[in-house]
Amino acid sequence: MIQYILAFFVFVFSTLASWYEGSEIRSNPWEWKYSAFFSQMLHGSITNSSDISQLDHFIYAAKFKPAFPLLMALSIIYIVMLTGYWLCRRSNKRFRLFYAGSLLFWILGAMVADSPTIGGHYFTMLFMTAGAGSAAMALLSVLRAKCWRGEELK
């Protein structure tokens, strides 16, 4: 329970800090075309800073000031992994299926891999590492289950 509370507070703090740091997008009109993804979906073209969506603050912060967005992503990944472990710890099959979701992390990593910004590189590394960690956990649960049942590994 302490882990959830701590991770939740880290998530809330890093979300507020990311939102604040990302508000810098409002004073950089040359970046609106590349970082105001949600605003362009909502309004079409952006003519002034009041057209910028609050969600675009997070995109801008993730691209150019990635410390707090990375902390935000790490804390939510930790909460999801902790919840998955807690829900699936009694059933090895469910546990393996949960961590087999590592493919989603690799897909996310591949989606941001082409980003020319420092934040894109950091998020690629984060998602690829989380995917590798999840795959390793799935492999370890399979190996542990086979060894526990006394099966020979092939």
Where does each model-flagged region fall?
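Alpha-helical transmembrane segments of multi-pass integral membrane proteins
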Residues: 96-154
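Membrane-helix exit/juxtamembrane interface segments
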Residues: 13-39
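Cytoplasmic juxtamembrane interface segments
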Residues: 1-17, 62-69, 147-148, 153
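Extracytosolic (periplasmic/ER-lumenal) interhelical loops and adjacent juxtamembrane/interface segments
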Residues: 30-59
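Transmembrane helix-loop junctions and nearby membrane-interface residues
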Residues: 15-22, 83-90, 110-117, 142-146
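Hydrophobic cores of alpha-helical transmembrane segments in multi-pass inner/ER membrane proteins
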Residues: 4-11, 75-79, 129-144
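Cytoplasmic juxtamembrane regions at transmembrane-helix boundaries
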Residues: 69-105
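Individual transmembrane alpha-helix segments
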Residues: 50-80
